Curated annotation (Swiss-Prot):
Family: Belongs to the bHLH protein family.
GO CC annotations, alphabetized: nucleus
Protein's recorded name: Transcription factor PIF4
Consequence the record notes for mutating residue 231 to D: In strain: cv. Bla-6, cv. Et-0, cv. Li-5:3, cv. Mt-0, cv. Pa-2 and cv. Tsu-1
Organism from which the protein derives: Arabidopsis thaliana (Mouse-ear cress)
Source lineage: Eukaryota, Viridiplantae, Streptophyta, Embryophyta, Tracheophyta
Length: 430
């Protein structure tokens, strides 16, 4: 069936192609432009407005930006249905258009894959997001590549824009794509200064220098902390050493003082001992010894000889009278002092008086043996050399000593006749 250049088959194929591009339940506006009828979709504008609102909300939610955008793009375009749907009757009213001379706005893309076509959202048409949406870039060396990836993901998250059905839209879409591309370049340059042109090379170098300076500053601070710790440790050790030295010095000073005091006391004691030994040496007659041990031996022998002489002198009865008649003079004793001591009977030393019966029973005590007397005289002659009276007393005969022994002996030697007086004064002899 042909009517004024109508081709049902061509119009049918054109309508099917249009219907394959247009989604179901799409509102179409008929416009007359340059002598041709142009289709303008009304639902596409509504969809773009909804997409703008979705894009604004997705900019606020940066964490779920990709997932929400992909879900919106899939929901807006359901899969194509059967091309032979009987409800589509619009193909009978657009047969005047020549299929060979189609406008550029109605070029149909061949369906290469079952995937639905992607529609580019105009980022420029939406209002600019607030400055709080995108945080300022953090200049870190390790995150430079991640920043580039984020910009690439942001660039590729916006789906590509194909030519719409309206003839006035392609120029706007191209402008929007170019503007979005420029914007992504600016963001990429801000995030990655090293990837800029030769004029931006100095900024990259300064960025690297800043990082090196920061690292060197950290190293310097750590070194300073270590030096401070070491300095404090050294000061503490020095103070401890000084304290130990002071304690040692005080202890050594105390020890030295104690040693000096001990030495002084020892010297004084030795001087006193030497003085006493000299005095003892002067008291012992005929003592020519110099050492202390020999001087002490001489003093002991001298005291023994004196004790023996005293015993011999007081064992005889006549020794006391002889001593009274001719007192024995010791060195250093004045005669007047000795006589004064004899006259006072209280100050006389008292010796034990030997019993006469004991003397008669033991004649050896009276030294009646001349040989024994000779031994005694020879033994202590050197000590009695300075005392002539004592030497003469020791050389007396035993009979002479017995003569002065006791008054009982003398009474026995007297005559038995003793004159007596009577009452009338006459004298009687018995």
């Amino acid at each position: 069936m042909e009517h004024q250049g109508w081709s049902f088959e061509e119009n049918y194929s054109l309508s099917t192609n249009r219907r394959s591009i247009r989604p179901q339940d799409e509102l179409v506006e008929l416009l007359w432009r340059d002598g041709q009828v142009v289709l303008q979709s009304q639902t596409h504008r509504e969809q773009t407005q909804t997409q703008k609102q979705d894009h604004h909300e997705e900019a606020l939610r940066s964490s779920t930006f990709l997932e929400d955008q992909e879900t919106v793009s899939w929901i807006q375009y359901p899969p194509d249905e059967d091309p032979f749907e009987p409800d589509d009757f619009s193909s009978h009213f657009f047969s005047t258009m020549d299929p060979l001379q189609r406008p550029t706005s109605e070029t149909v893309k061949p369906k290469s894959s079952p995937e639905p076509p992607q529609v580019m959202v105009k980022p420029k048409a939406c209002p600019d997001p607030p400055p709080q949406v995108m945080p300022p870039p953090k200049f870190r060396l390790t995150n430079s590549s991640s920043g580039i990836r984020e910009t690439e993901m942001e660039q590729y998250s916006v789906t590509t824009v194909g030519p719409s059905h309206c003839g006035s839209n392609p120029s706007q879409n191209d402008l929007d794509v170019s503007m979005s591309h420029d914007r992504s370049k600016n963001i990429e340059e801000k995030l990655n200064p090293n990837a800029s042109s030769s004029s931006g090379g100095s900024s990259g170098c300064s960025f690297g220098k800043d990082i090196k300076e920061m690292a060197s500053g950290r190293c310097i601070t750590t070194d300073r902390k270590r030096k401070r710790i070491n300095h404090t440790d050294e000061s503490v050790s020095l103070s401890d050493a000084i304290g130990n030295k002071s304690n040692q010095r005080s202890g050594s000073n105390r020890r030295s003082r104690a040693a000096e005091v001990h030495n002084l006391s020892e010297r004084r004691r030795r001087d006193r001992i030497n003085e006493r030994m000299k005095a003892l040496q002067e008291l012992i007659p005929h003592c020519s010894k110099t050492d202390k041990a020999s001087i002490l031996d001489e003093a002991i022998d001298y005291l023994k000889s004196l004790q023996l002489q005293l015993q011999v002198m007081w064992m005889g009865s006549g020794m006391a009278a002889a001593a009274a008649s001719a007192p024995m003079m010791f060195p250093g004793v004045q005669p007047q002092q000795f006589i004064r001591q004899i006259q006072s009977p209280v100050q006389l030393p008292r010796f034990p008086v030997m019993d006469q019966s004991a003397i008669q029973n033991n004649p050896g005590l009276v030294c009646q043996n001349p040989v024994q007397n000779q031994i005694i005289s020879d033994r202590f002659a050197r000590y009695i050399g300075g005392f002539p009276h004592m030497q003469a007393a020791t050389q007396m005969q035993p009979m002479e000593m017995l003569r002065f022994s006791s008054p009982a002996g003398q009474q026995s030697q007297q005559p038995s006749s003793v004159p007596t007086k009577t009452t009338d004064g006459s004298r009687l002899d018995h």
